[in-house]
């Protein structure tokens, strides 16, 4: 997790160092506020030459939902997504449309607290709510992930000092790491129950193996200085 954030920080600082001369020559840069599937955040944009822009950004998405009933287990759901980005835009065909490539440092976490309302299967065995107690699950995706996308909007070459941008793309992530534990139940420390709980955790992790991408759709409002 820390390695991912360190890598993207170094990448972003490198971009800013490289483009320093360009900023001095043009005297312009832009900042943008963003909202979309990554939550809310902001970007710093600087132009490199006539058709290349570099962006460094940060986004945050937090939300929670209480008392979701799934297969006789009542869950409280919480999501905390933190991302940092280093992106390069290549403007082709016209000044607005662009192809984008780069990296996102992801620190995304989903936690679930579950309370069975009746007997449920854990692994291959059925257990009562009293035996299970409460279940705590966590799915995490972190590290540095590549990004490819397209977009519209050119903060550095727009006729106006302010305007809108649109980005559509995909972050190619690792599959989530899953943890699952029980507390407050009569079987919470029972070796057989813990073995079945590990089977359940592995099944969930296997089911989530197909999730190796994160869709990005974001709308931005920029101001050029």
Predicted regions: what they are:
Residues 29, 38-42, 52, 82-86, ...:
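Hydrophobic, lipid-facing positions within transmembrane beta-strands of outer-membrane proteins
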Residues 48-50, 92-94, 154-158, 225:
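Outer-membrane beta-barrel strand-turn architecture
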Residues 89, 93, 212-225:
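Outer-membrane beta-barrel "beta-signal"
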């Amino acid at each position: 997790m820390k390695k991912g954030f360190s890598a993207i920080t170094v990448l972003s600082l490198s971009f800013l160092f490289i483009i320093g001369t360009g900023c001095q020559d043009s005297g312009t840069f832009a900042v943008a506020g963003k909202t979309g599937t990554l939550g809310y955040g902001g970007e710093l944009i600087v132009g490199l030459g006539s058709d290349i822009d570099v962006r460094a950004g940060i986004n945050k998405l937090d939300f929670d939902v209480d008392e979701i009933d799934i297969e006789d287990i009542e869950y409280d759901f919480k999501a905390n997504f933190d991302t940092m980005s280093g992106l390069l835009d290549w403007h082709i065909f016209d000044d607005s449309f662009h192809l984008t490539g780069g990296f996102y440092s992801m620190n995304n976490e989903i936690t679930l607290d579950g309370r069975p309302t009746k007997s449920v299967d854990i692994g291959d065995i059925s257990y009562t709510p009293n035996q299970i107690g409460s279940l705590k699950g966590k799915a995490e995706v972190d590290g540095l992930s590549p990004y490819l996308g397209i977009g519209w909007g050119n903060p550095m070459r727009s006729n106006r000092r302010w305007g809108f941008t649109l980005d559509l793309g995909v972050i190619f992530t690792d599959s989530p790491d899953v943890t699952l534990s029980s507390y407050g139940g009569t079987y919470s420390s029972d070796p057989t129950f813990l073995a079945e709980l590990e089977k359940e955790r592995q099944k969930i992790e296997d089911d989530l193996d197909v999730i190796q991408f994160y869709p990005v759709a974001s709308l931005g409002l920029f101001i050029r200085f």
